């Protein structure tokens, strides 16, 4: 469960413009809402046993609040783990920066929280590149679970152009 908590934290990363940039891009939250599949990511110890992560990103009643349901398949035994979390928009100008927290006791006071940015996304919201603000950990999300190798290569080139470390890449989806 601890691994899944950090997986979610990692997955909540938010993206920016199509070209390499030091800033995140504007996000249309109505279009960002919905189901995403993690297809690529940087290596991190929290997610080392997980593959085929699925993220359901759903707006709550408040305009700046979201609920997340993250599902991950463990590589070792195929067991499915799930985690529920909350996200709050921290930059309402761009809507591209979020703070993730766990509900209940662990999330009190934001102690179990992490900031994530959307660094890049498709104009039609078919894919997004997410990372921590310092880009130390990053993720590529896609609306489709099955993505061609050509599409993966293209998205990884975009991530590389934004300064994401390709030496730590993990192919996780589809």
Label every model-predicted segment.
Residues 18-174:
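A beta-rich soluble binding module of mature secreted/lumenal proteins
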Residues 7-15:
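Bacterial N-terminal signal peptides
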Residues 1-7:
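Bacterial N-terminal signal peptides that target proteins for export
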């Amino acid at each position: 469960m601890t691994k899944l908590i950090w997986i979610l934290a990692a997955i909540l990363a938010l993206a920016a413009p199509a070209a390499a940039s030091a800033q995140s891009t504007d996000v249309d939250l109505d279009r960002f809402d919905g189901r995403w599949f993690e297809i690529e990511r940087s290596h991190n110890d929290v997610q080392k046993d997980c593959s085929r992560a699925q993220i359901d990103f759903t707006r709550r009643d408040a305009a700046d609040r979201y609920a997340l349901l993250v599902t991950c398949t463990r590589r070792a035994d195929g067991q499915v783990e799930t985690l529920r979390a909350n996200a709050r928009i921290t930059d309402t100008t761009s809507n591209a920066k979020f703070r993730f927290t766990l509900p209940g006791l662990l999330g009190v006071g934001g102690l179990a929280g992490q900031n994530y940015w959307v660094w890049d996304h498709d104009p039609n919201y078919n894919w997004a590149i997410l990372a921590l603000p310092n880009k130390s950990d990053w993720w590529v999300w896609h609306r489709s679970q099955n993505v061609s190798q050509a599409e993966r290569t293209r998205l990884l080139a975009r991530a590389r152009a934004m300064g994401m470390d390709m030496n730590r890449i993990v192919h996780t989806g589809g």
